[in-house]
C-alpha cells in the first residue's frame, strides 16, 4: 500500500500530462478475440512462464510500455525485464512491463504516461473468453481496485481479487516483482480515473454520513415515540427525569422542549376555550338583560297610562265638588219654633234683625 501511495504521489504535474490523463478512456478500446486453438494453447502454458517462440499468445506475453527514458541496467534488450525467472523474448518480442525493480527504476521519469501507453496496448491483447469478463467488468474491477485499495487497504479483498482475475494467469510473475508492477499499474490507473474516484469517494462518504444521520434520527424518533403527547403533558417532572436516565443530553433537551411546547399549546387552548366560554356566557346574559329592559319599558308605559287615567278622574271629581258646596251655603234654613212670653217675642225680633 505504501508503494501505491508513493506511485500516486509521483503523478505528472504538467498541464499536457494532466489533460491527457483526464481525456483517457478505457472503453474506446476493443477486445481482440483469439481462435479456440490459441486459447487451448494458452491453457497448456504453465502459469508465470513466457513464450520464447513467435507463436506467442495473449496469456503468455503482453506488449511493453513505450519508454520515454533511457533503459536502466536492469531492463532486457527486448524492451522490458522478465518477471519471475523469465528472459527477454527472441526477435525483439517485448517482455512483461512490470518485471522487477529495475523496470520501475528505468521508467521513473514519466511513470504515469508510460503506464497509460502500456494499458492502451494491453487492452488489445486480452482474451475475455478465457477470463469470462467483458470490457465493462474490467473497467469496474479497475475502478473498484483503485478506489478501495487507496482508501481502505485490506478491508475490501473482493476488489483486489477482481483485479487479479482481470490481470490473468500469464501476467503473474515473481512475488516482489509482481507487487511492484501492481503498484505501478495502480498508480497509472489512479491518475487516469482520479476525477471519477474522487467523485465516487465523495458519494461514498456522503452515503455513510446520511446513514449515520438516519440512524440517529431513528433513535430520536424512537425516544420521542416512547412517550405519547398525553403522557408527556400529564407526567410530572420527577417521573420524566427518572424515565430519561441513560439517554444523551441532546435527546433529553429535545424531549423536554417538546413537552414544554405541548404544555404551552394546551395552556393556550385552555385559555382560548375559557375566553370563548365566557364570551358565550356574557352574550347570553346580555340578551337576557336586553329582554328585561324591554319588559321594564313596557311596564313603565303601562303605569304612565294608568297614572294619566287616575289624574283625569281626580280632576273630574275635584271640579264637580267645588260649585255644589258654594250653592248649598245660600239655602234658607228652617225657622226654630217661637218661644212663649215676652222673651220669645224679643228673640224673634232679634233673629230678623
From Swiss-Prot:
Signal peptide positions on this chain: none
Compartment(s): Nucleus
The UniProt record lists the keyword ATP-binding: no
Keyword Transcription attributed: yes
This protein's UniProt keywords: Activator, Diabetes mellitus, Disease variant, DNA-binding, Isopeptide bond, Nucleus, Phosphoprotein, Transcription, Transcription regulation, Ubl conjugation
Tissue specificity note: Expressed in the islets of Langerhans (at protein level).
Position(s), cross-link Glycyl lysine isopeptide (Lys-Gly) (interchain with G-Cter in SUMO2): 32
Domain bZIP: 254-317
Comp. bias intervals (Low complexity): 46-73
Biased composition (Basic residues): 183-210
Post-translational modification: Ubiquitinated, leading to its degradation by the proteasome. Phosphorylated at tyrosines.
Pfam families cross-referenced by the UniProt entry: bZIP_Maf (PF03131), Maf_N (PF08383)
Homology family: Belongs to the bZIP family. Maf subfamily.
PANTHER family, A to Z: TRANSCRIPTION FACTOR MAF, TRANSCRIPTION FACTOR MAFA
Subunit structure: Forms homodimers or heterodimers. Monomers and dimers are able to bind DNA, but the off-rate is faster for monomers. Interacts with NEUROD1 and PDX1. May interact with MAFB, FOS, JUN and PCAF.
Role according to the record: Transcription factor that activates insulin gene expression. Acts synergistically with NEUROD1/BETA2 and PDX1. Binds the insulin enhancer C1/RIPE3b element. Binds to consensus TRE-type MARE 5'-TGCTGACTCAGCA-3' DNA sequence.
Descriptive protein name: Transcription factor MafA
Species assigned in the record: Homo sapiens
Amino acid at each position: 500500500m505504501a508503494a501505491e501511495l508513493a506511485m500516486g504521489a509521483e503523478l505528472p504535474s504538467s498541464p499536457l500530462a494532466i489533460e491527457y490523463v483526464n481525456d483517457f478512456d478505457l472503453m474506446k478500446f476493443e477486445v481482440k478475440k483469439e481462435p479456440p486453438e490459441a486459447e487451448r494453447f494458452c491453457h497448456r502454458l504453465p502459469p508465470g512462464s513466457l513464450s520464447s517462440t513467435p507463436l506467442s499468445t495473449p496469456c503468455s506475453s503482453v506488449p511493453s510500455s513505450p519508454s520515454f527514458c533511457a533503459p536502466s541496467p536492469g531492463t532486457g534488450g527486448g524492451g522490458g525485464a522478465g518477471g519471475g525467472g523469465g528472459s527477454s523474448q527472441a526477435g525483439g518480442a517485448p517482455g512483461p512491463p512490470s518485471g522487477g525493480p529495475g523496470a520501475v527504476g528505468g521508467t521513473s521519469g514519466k511513470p504515469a504516461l508510460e503506464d497509460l501507453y502500456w494499458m492502451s496496448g494491453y487492452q488489445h491483447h486480452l482474451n475475455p473468453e478465457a477470463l469470462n469478463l467483458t470490457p465493462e467488468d474490467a473497467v469496474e474491477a479497475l475502478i473498484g481496485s483503485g478506489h478501495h485499495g487507496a482508501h481502505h487497504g485490506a478491508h475490501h479483498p473482493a476488489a483486489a481479487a477482481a483485479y487479479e482475475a482481470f490481470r490473468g494467469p500469464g501476467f503473474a510473475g515473481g512475488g516482489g516483482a509482481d507487487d511492484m508492477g501492481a503498484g505501478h499499474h495502480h498508480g497509472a490507473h489512479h491518475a487516469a480515473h482520479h476525477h471519477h474516484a474522487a467523485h465516487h469517494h465523495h458519494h461514498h462518504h456522503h452515503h455513510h454520513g446520511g446513514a449515520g444521520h438516519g440512524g440517529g434520527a431513528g433513535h430520536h424518533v424512537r425516544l420521542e415515540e416512547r412517550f405519547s403527547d398525553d403522557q408527556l403533558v400529564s407526567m410530572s417532572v420527577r417521573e420524566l427525569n427518572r424515565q430519561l436516565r441513560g439517554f444523551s443530553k441532546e435527546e433529553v433537551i429535545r424531549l423536554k422542549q417538546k413537552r414544554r411546547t405541548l404544555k404551552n399549546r394546551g395552556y393556550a387552548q385552555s385559555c382560548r376555550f375559557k375566553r370563548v366560554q365566557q364570551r358565550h356566557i356574557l352574550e347570553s346574559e346580555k340578551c337576557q338583560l336586553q329582554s328585561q329592559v324591554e319588559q321594564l319599558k313596557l311596564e313603565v308605559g303601562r303605569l304612565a297610562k294608568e297614572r294619566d287615567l287616575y289624574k283625569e278622574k281626580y280632576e273630574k271629581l275635584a271640579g264637580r265638588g267645588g260649585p255644589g258646596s258654594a250653592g248649598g251655603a245660600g239655602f234658607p234654613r228652617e225657622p226654630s219654633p217661637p218661644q212663649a212670653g215676652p222673651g220669645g217675642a224679643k228673640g224673634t225680633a232679634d233673629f230678623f234683625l
